[in-house]
């Protein structure tokens, strides 16, 4: 069973399907890991709100651009339970790296 975490996301994204939101966040984090070696900094925009993935007490937080707080304010964010993003991203990136190696002569 995969680890579960609470990911804090902007309230403006609450009207999206939870499944689609989880998939989009995970896909964005996986791309960030493959390209930069870390999931932090993964950035995405939905409903004219841009947010960047940061770590908050070992929990993923999609912090809105311009938010200077050091914590996800409950008035601006909601928590969503999801599989460990880093664990999922690591599996995807290792698979990607293996495919890349197998294609080289």
Swiss-Prot record:
Top-level taxonomy: Viruses, Viruses incertae sedis, Polydnaviriformidae, Bracoviriform, Microplitis demolitor bracovirus
Domain of life: Viruses
Record protein name field: Uncharacterized protein M2
Organism name: Microplitis demolitor bracovirus (isolate Webb)
């Amino acid at each position: 069973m995969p680890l579960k975490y609470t990911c804090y996301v902007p309230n403006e994204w609450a009207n999206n399907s939870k499944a689609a939101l989880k998939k989009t966040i995970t896909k964005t984090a996986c791309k960030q890991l493959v390209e930069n070696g870390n999931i932090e900094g993964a950035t995405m925009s939905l409903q004219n709100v841009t947010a960047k993935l940061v770590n908050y007490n070992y929990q993923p937080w999609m912090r809105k651009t311009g938010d200077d707080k050091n914590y996800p304010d409950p008035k601006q964010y909601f928590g969503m339970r999801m599989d460990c993003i880093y664990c999922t991203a690591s599996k995807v990136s290792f698979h990607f790296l293996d495919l890349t190696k197998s294609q080289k002569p």
